[in-house]
Amino acid sequence: MTIMRKTHPLMKMVNHAFIDLPTPANISGWWNFGSLLGLCLVIQIASGLFLAMHYTPDTMTAFSSVTHICRDVNYGWLIRYMHANGASLFFICLYLHIGRGIYYGSYSYLETWNIGIILLFLTMATVFMGYVLPWGQMSFWGATVITNLLSAIPYIGTDLVEWIWGGFSVDKATLNRFFAFHFILPFIIAAMAMVHLLFLHETGSNNPLGIPSDCDKIPFHPYYTTKDFLGIVLLLAFFFTMVXFFPDLLGDPDNYSPANPLNTPPHIKPEWYFLFAYAILRSIPNKLGGVIALVMSILVLALLPHIQTSKQRSLMFRPISQFLFWLLVADVLILTWIGGQPVEPPFIIIGQIASLLYFTIILALMPIAGIIENKMLKW
């Protein structure tokens, strides 16, 4: 008798994706972050659904509805902090996932990589709109500053901004539409994640050596289900420690003040996961130039498959490229720090140097290093 999971139409799909999937035998813990991102998305959708039951997207009551959730709803404080810190956890996993993709050359899978970049943009849009919903000071001013960047687009910019706002400033219409988009986007992200997986399973997973692994594959279950489960346990332990003991560690104190259009905070800044891009935006004195640099800071990832010069896929045996990769990681951390600092010397010049270095490493130094390494190996 044939096993049901191999014949039933629905079970067959699950079987091919998570049970009998041929997987390289040598993939490391760095390959766990895909499943962890799936877990983060489930946490966010579940906690967000319960928050939406009590939240009101109205400028007069949004802030007090969040207060009501924290004070009056059963375990409302827990759900709210799970949702807020879940976003941070999502981006920690996301950046580690992207870093692993760059290090081991996973960007060679073009469709999977490009859908990953679309997923990153969708996640950033979702998180930005979610940050506006509590209607605190930083919510309001963050929304005003970031949406206002679109006015830099020639000719249609001003009309575009007013169209997004639904008026002449960030107001009730803006909050309402942001809530609607924030609610629907995670489901679009979930659908895109399925497409991401679909394309990944067309080619099979990459591995640390960056070489074809068709000759040495093992079934996903039980080997990698067990490995993923360990990752999930460690992630949840870290997550709940954070939620229960340090819930406001990554938040902004300004967001505990209700939004006031008449009072500008001394330093407007986004959440920590956008600070590197915000620092790149601020490092260019021209508004349109800054917006282009901001978009390119993410979009530059799409160029990676086209500017790879090395004949080796992974960085595992490429010491010069390894050095440049870790220099890039350090540079992104410096940009993150600079993004949270006021616009004054010496932070301005540090931000400009770090921004220039960011694009130089990706677009020039890494391709040059690949050519040098090929020459060293007489390839």
From Swiss-Prot:
Offer one Pfam family short name for this entry.
Answer: Cytochrom_B_C
What is this protein called in UniProt? Cytochrome b
Q: Which cofactor does it need?
A: heme b
Report the locations given in the UniProt record.
Mitochondrion inner membrane
The record's similarity note reads: Belongs to the cytochrome b family.
Cofactor binding remark = Binds 2 heme b groups non-covalently.
| Species | Dipodomys simulans (Dulzura kangaroo rat)
InterPro entries xrefs: Cyt_b/b6_C, Cyt_b/b6_C_sf, Cyt_b/b6_N, Cytb/b6-like_sf, Cytochrome_b, Cytochrome_b_C_euk/bac, Cytochrome_b_N_euk/bac, Di-haem_cyt_TM
Q: Does the keyword Lipid biosynthesis apply?
A: no
**Corresponding gene?**
MT-CYB
